[in-house]
Amino acid sequence: MFEARSIAAAETRSLRHRVLWPHKSSPDVCTIDVDEAEHAHHVGAFNAEGEHVGVCSLFHQRSDRFPEALPINDDVYRLRVMGTLPEVRGRGAGAAIVRYAANWSREQGAVWLWCDAREAAFPFYERMGFKFVSEGYHVSEIGPHRMMALKL
């Protein structure tokens, strides 16, 4: 059983480093330019013992790469820098994060939740109801991605 809840931006860095960006020098540099933006919201997943096992961040942001992928008049939130510790994958931590993110985004008035999904995560996002809305593209130092979106 996993619980997802709001966390501070600084609480995302350790898991981002361990799960998403181990090639970076330290957790302190595992930030993104919009972490402290006005509409930024950060989410952590915690196991029954209270250990922080998953993370994502949400931003009130349209896609610069594929601006036409979602209806222009629809409000959107972007799910970004999501990951879970390898030992909890397939056990519900990621699903708890996405459910929380979708509910929170809907409460903010969003119609869509979208992400730049890593190729390895395509099956997970598809199981969560996301659909592909772009062709594939390459993200430097990370690998193949596609834009995916969930209608809220």
Residue ranges and their predicted role:
Residues 88-100:
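Conserved acetyl-CoA pyrophosphate-binding loop and the N-cap/start of the following alpha-helix
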Residues 1-8:
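Conserved N-terminal entry element of GNAT/NAT acetyltransferase domains
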Residues 44, 51-62, 66-70, 78-83:
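Conserved beta-strand in the GNAT
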Residues 98, 105-118:
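Conserved GNAT acetyl-CoA-binding A-motif
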Residues 16-49, 63:
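Active-site rim helix/loop that mediates acceptor-substrate recognition in acyltransferases
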Residues 16, 125, 130:
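Conserved active-site tyrosine of GNAT-family acetyltransferases
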